[in-house]
């Protein structure tokens, strides 16, 4: 018997046969729910049809001249120009590779996969088969004369018509057979007949010329844009790596990694063991972008953007060794309870393999069984039963060294199988997924991956050379294409610092130094609550006295008063056990309490979202702080920590801490709306199938209806299957209603929307289906309101560096404050020393020539390398100049209110993202409490009803204040 038979509990099985472990936390239903929408834009399309509105053209607004504000600044990029030296014509073909196993089952190698191991294994085999065929069938492929570009799966491009000479009307399909025994790939040796099929696609031949690339790759009408140029160039750059799977691992979206990083020129510090059987290794992400180039507006030039990265992979090691790195408990004696569950979470979903049956067999890990091979039993074909350990002794002559170690659970062809852990190894080339990370692991991995700019530049250049993105690439040579050796230098601009004050006209200016500031008195102190309370929430082991809490309360109230909030003494101040805090909060509500300040023991991580649910339900503001932070205020005198806490208090209570100087009244008659999205975590799609709805997207939004520079908002639920946002109509309508409420019925002259949560590939759909719904909402108020619609993205590969980075990285900084008096050493440069400063702007050369676009780095980078947001204008009724658009966007990045630093995103968008997160947490809390109503009807109506059950709109005045500060 080649593999361990299924171990399960059939009808009539003896009680000693154990069932598999508990099902996953979010099971797929027997007949799974499906979204009623067939495409990712159906909700918007359906609503447009109801309104009798035609979709808009997928047409970018006309680009305008670059902005003029600021002083010129030299910026180093990670963009490498691509030069085309000859014209070509490329034909596209489909590739299908199959074989038949001994049991008669057909295997398709070119079938797409999702898991890392499946993807890389199929790439490996497909490449081995196709490149063998290039030699065996040289006459058909015209191998010596043609330039062949393969994607490692089912797409092949050739600059020669492979079917030239076939008679008219003939079936243009080439069937080939290959013997796996003649190939070098060990997994193919046992396959005597591998079938390869090549046939033309319906796509026309691609005219690969400079003129065609410039015209078809970057047309402002997206329906005229051909993605084939981008695809061909991307695959051409990847060919050396795809063809040499012993050196490279290639994934989708331009990501690649190196089997032997040190042998490819990387340094030892680039490969870091982060524990739990995981290792951070260097890699690249490359994307083809068509940019304006150095010769001004109206030009289009191909380029490759290369970003270095460090990503955690699971080590190729025995599972037993991996678990020994995860837990301190003796794995050989068996894991139980929470420790077993913790280890299972780290390895769930991984591919592993065994060799005890005489050949390599792969298994996908579902979990860890609660028993080991010594005790776990299963039925034999003769009706008897035996232990797993005895079975391996009898059938494979294997005496297990660790029979008490938990069995590994694997699901194969619908059966649940159990395997001895000591006989399994983790397969190579598997990236660590978020659910496989503990909190501590996540922090450590993030720290190792967040490299400083000088290190990132080294990773980029080392990786570029190792991946042969250069003249060494034989395929590029055949195409007549070359990649520039050096990255582009561009002329950006540095925008002047934003002036902050206690009033928009500039009264009581705030001192801004190095893009940092501290406000004294608040611009608009909140009205202090008449009745409020302060509690410490802890356990029996929490160490804080009531006197210490009272001291903190005194300092809290005193600083509030110094900033203009006349906080009375708390009506109730107590130490509360975590089990009693919910009832105490509801009691506080009954006593007319409107604000509760809670200090929670750091070890308690389950209550914060419960506080927020109670806050929404009772309209009583609840602010939460970690105990360690509070003690640092009392014991270490950390006044800045307390100041930031009180900044948050003032905003939560409806106040404003500071504003930027707006003497020209740029925001007058402007409604600014931010729209952010929280997508459901992986694996939670069916969290609420019993309620008639799939786990939704949560769309947060924020607007400045009440005061020009203050943003509050709410959230709505939307189908997770939709890339465009049908609720944008309701969002714009609600925001305009709120604006009218605080402007005596008046309407704004202009609505500016900052929208995130999308990629460049969705721009056309947003312009065609989403923006018309926003306009429809505006027309219900007035046809004269202008719309400016901007999408903001950090999901790109562009990086910007200081031009003198090498000298800065080697230059000692000011002496570290932690150094002793006698051994003071210059401190190493920090992230903020090496990264580009706030206010750096790039709106030419590396931008898309078809649209109005700019990069704006508005924040101080505290860790790693700056990720500069990209702003793309999708609607511009006002024809706003780039100067004005960039200026107001930068100013809006200075209204965070809590800490005295600019943010990476404009405040309306930052706050909208926070509302999306809050909405997700409230949704999860409602699901956990089974507090979600069962709904029926069309999906859009169901989601609206569910939104009403958890959003802030139903909580009265909470939408008028930024409760998620």
Curated annotation (Swiss-Prot):
Subcellular localization: Cytoplasm, Perinuclear region; Cytoplasmic granule; Cytoplasm
Piwi domain: residues covered: 594-924
Any Gene Ontology CC annotation: perinuclear region of cytoplasm
Region of interest (Disordered), residue spans: 1-34
Keyword Ribosomal protein attached: no
Matches recorded under Pfam families: PAZ (PF02170), Piwi (PF02171)
Molecular function GO terms recorded: miRNA binding; RNA endonuclease activity; single-stranded RNA binding
Bias-annotated ranges (Pro residues): 21-30
Function, as annotated: Argonaute protein which is involved in the endogenous small interfering RNA (endo-siRNA) pathway and is required for RNA-mediated gene silencing (RNAi) in the germline. Interacts with secondary 22G-RNAs, which are RNA-dependent RNA polymerase-derived endo-siRNAs, typically 22 nucleotides in length with a 5'guanosine residue. Also interacts with the mRNA targets of 22G-RNAs. Associates with znfx-1 to mediate small RNA-directed transgenerational epigenetic inheritance of both germline- and soma-expressed genes.
Additional remarks: Members of the WAGO (worm-specific argonaute) subfamily lack conserved metal-binding residues found in other argonaute proteins and probably do not cleave target mRNAs directly.
Designated name of the protein: Argonaute protein wago-4
Organism annotation: Caenorhabditis elegans
């Amino acid at each position: 018997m080649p593999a361990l038979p299924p171990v399960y509990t059939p009808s009539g099985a003896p009680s000693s046969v154990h069932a598999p472990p508990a099902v996953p936390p979010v099971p797929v239903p027997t007949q799974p729910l499906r979204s009623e929408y067939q495409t990712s834009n159906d909700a918007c399309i359906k609503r447009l049809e109801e309104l009798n509105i035609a979709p808009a053209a997928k047409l970018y607004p006309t680009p305008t001249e670059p902005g003029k504000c600021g002083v010129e600044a030299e910026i180093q990029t990670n963009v490498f120009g691509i030069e085309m030296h000859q014209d070509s014509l490329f034909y596209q073909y489909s590739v299908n590779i199959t074989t038949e196993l001994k049991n008669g089952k057909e295997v398709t190698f070119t079938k797409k996969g999702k898991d890392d191991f499946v993807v890389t294994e199929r790439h490996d085999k497909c490449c081995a088969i196709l490149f063998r065929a290039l030699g065996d069938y040289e006459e058909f492929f015209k191998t010596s004369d043609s330039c062949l570009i393969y994607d490692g799966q089912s797409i092949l491009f050739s600059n020669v018509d492979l079917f030239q000479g076939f008679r008219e009307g003939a079936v243009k399909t080439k069937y080939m057979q290959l013997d796996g025994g003649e190939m070098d790939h060990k997994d193919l040796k046992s396959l005597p007949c591998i079938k390869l099929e090549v046939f033309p696609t319906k796509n026309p031949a691609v005219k690969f010329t400079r003129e065609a690339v410039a015209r078809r790759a970057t047309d402002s009408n997206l329906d005229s844009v051909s993605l084939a140029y981008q695809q061909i160039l991307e695959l051409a750059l990847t060919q050396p790596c795809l063809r040499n799977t012993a050196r490279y691992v290639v994934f989708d979206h331009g990501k690649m990694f190196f089997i032997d990083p040190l042998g490819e020129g990387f340094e030892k510090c680039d490969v870091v063991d982060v524990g739990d059987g995981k290792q951070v290794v260097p890699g690249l992400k490359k994307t083809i972008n068509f940019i304006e180039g150095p010769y001004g507006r109206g030009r289009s030039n191909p380029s490759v953007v290369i970003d270095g990265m460090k990503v955690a992979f699971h080590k190729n090691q025995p599972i037993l060794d991996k678990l020994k790195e995860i837990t301190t408990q003796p794995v050989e004696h068996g894991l139980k309870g929470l420790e077993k569950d913790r280890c299972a979470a780290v390895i769930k979903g991984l591919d592993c393999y065994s060799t005890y049956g005489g050949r390599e067999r792969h298994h996908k890990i579902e979990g860890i069984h609660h028993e080991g091979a010594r005790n776990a039993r299963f039925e034999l074909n003769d009706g008897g039963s035996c232990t797993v350990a005895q079975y391996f002794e009898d059938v494979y002559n294997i005496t297990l060294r660790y029979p008490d170690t938990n069995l590994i659970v694997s699901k194969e062809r619908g059966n649940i199988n159990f395997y001895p852990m000591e006989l399994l190894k983790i397969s190579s080339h598997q990236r660590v997924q978020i659910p496989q990370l503990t909190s501590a692991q996540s922090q450590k991995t993030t720290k190792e991956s967040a490299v400083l700019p000088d290190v990132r530049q080294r990773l980029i250049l080392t990786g570029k050379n190792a991946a042969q993105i250069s003249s060494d690439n034989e395929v590029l040579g055949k195409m007549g294409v070359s990649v520039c050796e050096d990255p582009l230098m561009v002329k950006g601009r540095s925008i002047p610092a934003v002036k902050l004050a206690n009033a928009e006209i500039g009264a009581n200016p705030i001192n801004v130094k190095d893009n940092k500031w501290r406000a004294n008195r608040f611009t608009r102190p909140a009205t202090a609550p008449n009745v409020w309370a302060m509690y410490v929430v802890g356990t029996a082991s929490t160490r804080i006295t009531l006197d210490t809490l009272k001291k903190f309360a005194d300092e809290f109230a005193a600083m509030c008063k110094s900033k203009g909030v006349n906080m009375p003494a708390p009506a109730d101040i107590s130490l509360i056990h975590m089990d009693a805090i919910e009832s105490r909060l509801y009691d506080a509500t009954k006593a007319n309490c409107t604000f509760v300040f809670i200090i929670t023991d750091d070890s308690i991580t389950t209550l914060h979202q419960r506080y927020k649910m109670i806050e929404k339900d009772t309209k009583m503001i609840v602010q939460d702080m970690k105990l360690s932070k509070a003690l640092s205020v009392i014991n270490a005198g950390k006044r800045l920590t307390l100041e930031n806490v009180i900044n948050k208090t003032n905003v939560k209570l409806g106040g404003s801490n500071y504003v930027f100087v707006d003497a020209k009244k740029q925001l007058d008659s402007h409604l600014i709306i931010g729209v952010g999205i929280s997508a459901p975590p992986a694996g939670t799609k069916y969290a609420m199938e019993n309620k008639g709805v799939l786990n939704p997207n949560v769309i947060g939004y924020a607007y400045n209806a009440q005061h020009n520079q203050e943003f509050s908002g709410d959230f709505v639920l939307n189908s997770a299957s939709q890339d465009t946002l049908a609720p944008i109509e309701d969002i714009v309508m609600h925001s305009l209603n709120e604006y009218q409420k605080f402007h005596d019925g008046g309407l704004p002259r202009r609505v500016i929307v900052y929208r995130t949560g999308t990629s460049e590939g969705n721009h056309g759909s947003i312009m065609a289906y989403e923006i018309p719904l926003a306009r429809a909402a505006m027309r219900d108020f007035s046809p004269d309101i202008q719309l400016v619609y901007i999408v903001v993205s950090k999901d790109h590969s562009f990086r910007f560096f200081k031009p003198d980075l090498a000298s800065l990285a080697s230059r000692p900084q000011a002496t570290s404050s932690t150094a002793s008096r006698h051994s003071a050493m210059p401190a190493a440069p920090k992230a903020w020393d090496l990264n580009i400063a706030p206010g750096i702007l790039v709106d030419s050369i590396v931008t898309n020539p078809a649209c109005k676009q700019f990069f704006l780095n508005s924040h101080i980078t505290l860790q790693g390398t700056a990720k500069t947001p990209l702003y793309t204008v999708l609607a511009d009724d006002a024809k706003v100049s780039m100067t004005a658009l960039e200026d107001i966007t930068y100013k809006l990045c200075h209204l965070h209110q809590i800490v005295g630093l600019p943010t990476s995103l404009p405040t309306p968008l930052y706050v909208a993202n926070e509302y999306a997160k809050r909405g997700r947490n409230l949704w999860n809390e409602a699901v956990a409490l089974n507090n979600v109503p069962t709904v029926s009807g069309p999906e859009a109506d169901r989601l609206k009803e569910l939104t009403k059950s958890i959003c802030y709109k139903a909580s009265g005045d909470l939408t008028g204040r930024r409760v998620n500060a």
